[in-house]
Amino acid sequence: MTIRALGDIRVVELTTELWSAFGAALLGDFGADVIRVEDLSRPARDPDRDGTRPPGGFDADSELVQRNKRSIGLDLRDPAARQVLADLLATADVFLTDLPFAEIEAQGWSYDDLAAANPGIVYVRGSGFGPRGPDRDLPALDELAAARTGVMPTLPQPGEPPVYAGAGQMYTAVMLAFGTLVALHERAESGEGQVVDASLFAGNMYGSSLMLDAYMAMRDDRLSVPVSRLDAGNPMSGAGLAYPTSDGRWVTLTMPDTDRWWPSFSEMMGLDVDDPRWDTHDKRCGEGRREMMAILEERFSQQSGAYWRERFSEARLSADIMERYEYAADYTQAAVNRYILELEHPSYGRYQSLGFPVHMGDTPARLRRMAPGVGQHGAEVLQEVLGRSDAEIAELESAGVLGTVRAEDASRPSTQSGESREPERAVSTGAGPLAGVRVLDLTVWFQGPVCGQLLADFGADVIHIERPEFGDPARGVRSINAIPVAEWNQYFLVVNRNKRSMAIDLKSDAGRELLHRMVEQADVFLWNQSMDNLATLGLDYETLSAINPKLVFATNSGYGHRGSNRPAFDMTVQALTGIMTRLGEPGQPPIYLGLGGGDAFGGLMSALGIMVALHHRRETGRGQYVDASLLGSQLYLAVPSLQRFLASHNPYYADQHSRHAARNPLWNRYRAEDGWMFICMEDTEESFASFCAATGAAVLCDDPRFSSHQARRIEHESLVKELDSVMAERTTGEWMQRFAEHGVVAAPILDFRDMAVDEQAWANDYLLRAPCGEAGGDVEFRGLPVTLSRTPGRVEQLGLELGQDTELALFDTFGVSWDEIAELKVKGAIP
């Protein structure tokens, strides 16, 4: 019998969007009993509302985000149905919803309402823009949130339209699951529930983490504009860096300019390592970088992509070829690590699907049931959970309260634009919901440190263990996109906040023995360096779990716990997923999702896996091995298009698509007089009439080419062209005023300068201030992406000096005497 890590948890889910449903599915994958409530009075969500899913195939999105759930269909207009929902919620550990705040309050489904009957309920809410602030009631659409974060204008080549990648919503989905488990962990101690909020706004901010961190520190507007692919700050790495090969493919390089990479790379490319044009870091990443990139451009163009991939592999370089989705679908690493599955659907036959991004050694995620039909388990749920009799169930069915068919048209008034009561800001006064969890964080650069940061933000005692003398290589970051870092190194300090710092030489016998002693008193061991080094250093899972069977042993590998262990950085791995080659206008170079975007998502996935393992340990007393890889995580960043490709193998989902050819012109990006805007409207007769009224372009409504939904689909390119002309006539501010008057959903596409002063971001602690010793005062930085109402996270300090806490931590936390500490110094174990 398979052990289910979350088998003791019941989740009642009432959602309308795919990203929030996916948050619940992640809990179901690890064994939670997820009961999806389908409101029969609402029509089904149109999977092609944005025009990105052409006719044909089946609803692959739903097969992914609704798996491992049971479904009950209730007509929630009926008081009897609402009573059934109330009864279900009284038995639930978690209620997960994405309904608008105003509707939640109007229906009597607020946290206060539910907690009166079930004080321990964890109330999880997926919102658009957070629980507080002036814009908390804006529609929860990922495009609107992405437009506001500042990242969209930075992604393409100069002169190209802002790029919407669709990845922010995947951050939010995982944040919902992570926040749920943090609150459940705290509930196990206090017995009390609370509200968890994860918003699309916060998800998209974390998707642009490194660039946003850099802008908040440097306030340099050059970070808000696109960078040409041959103007990268490092010829061996850069957000837009791409070199074409002889067969029309693209090379990506992701190697910091250090002694670890430069000699090997220069030798492979036939560059003289001692050439005075680039014999120092400052020359290679400064005055000599453009000349070197021109030489590399010419040399890469002489050979095929396959040739270069083989050379990179031989030299063990973090470099590869940017692939399409076809590669990901057949990639052995994705299959052997269960990131992509081969499934058999009872109606559609054989197909591929995304699998499970986090590996758990003892309690792996499983596909226990396919996505259910609407209301498929209604009778089962009522009997098993509520003890209803057959006669009672039959009565509900005959009254239309319980069923399996959704309404075809909306029959309830929309509350999406209504206003709701803003909750008071929670103030953290205790030790945090993860107090008592001790993490030994032996990670470097970004992915692993992000994981440790998320745990530390919520109160875990995270001890960052670095090598003496130099420490984490991220301490040496000098520039972002060829722009010198500010007076403080935000790259390192932000993701290592709230941690203690220790310096231990793990190459010495005494250092390894010391770490083994610390493992005895640790809950989590976290590692993202070379997997080969674990056994060499005596830090492998078998060794450490023998020392402490309760230890959660967490790694952040590059390509998974099985198969390849070659060097991996964010962009190199992202290149293999296919997401980069489908973004942007046709013919443009592949587009990287943004500095650190994949790393940060991998760190979030790792934190989720650790929380699952800690929950299971509470029940069993045993830890286990957890791995969250860059490959597994980044495949999930591509869910909105990759899942559809895997199910259909339709190249449409792997191709670049021009905004000029948007299949729904009302869900598209347009340039206004002073900047770009994102309009997000389903193409219905009502919405088209509202849009025409807002723009004053009534002539469009009378144009026979656009007289119906079907006609507009046929003439979609002509309509985009007309709207381009119309939108250019006014400023974004003028358009937003007119759109608000006519109910048109839209947002200006902003830059990082706007993001830095965004009132909504500050109101929800998505941006924070804290003292920074390196800067000599307070600094502003990316804050807390998940809000807990009763035990919120907090930031007390940014990253510390190397080894600052070594001696005190050994004495106070691990019980090492001062005499022993002196001896460790003599042996070179600590500085």
Where is each model-derived feature located?
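Terminal low-complexity tails and localization/encapsulation signals of metabolic enzymes
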Residues: M1-R10, R229-L230, P244-S246, E291, ...
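A short glycine-threonine-serine/GTX helix/turn-capping micro-motif
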Residues: P161-Y171, G193-V195, L230-G238, V251-T252, ...
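Aromatic-enriched alpha-helical interface/lid elements that frame and gate functional surfaces
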Residues: A239-A315, A319, P665-H742, A746
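Short Gly/Pro-enriched turn/cap motifs at secondary-structure boundaries
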Residues: S62, L223-P235, L241-A242, Y348-Y351, ...
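Substrate-binding/catalytic subdomain of NAD(P)-dependent oxidoreductase enzymes
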Residues: A165, A183-L230, W308, Y325-Y327, ...
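N-terminal helix-loop segment corresponding to the beta1-alpha1 unit
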Residues: M1-E192, G373, A379-Y625, Y653, ...
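Mid-domain beta-loop-alpha active-site segment that forms a flexible
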Residues: G166-L181, L200-L212, D257, W261, ...
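Short, well-structured beta-strand/strand-turn elements
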Residues: V34, S313-Y327, R388-I393, V462-I465, ...
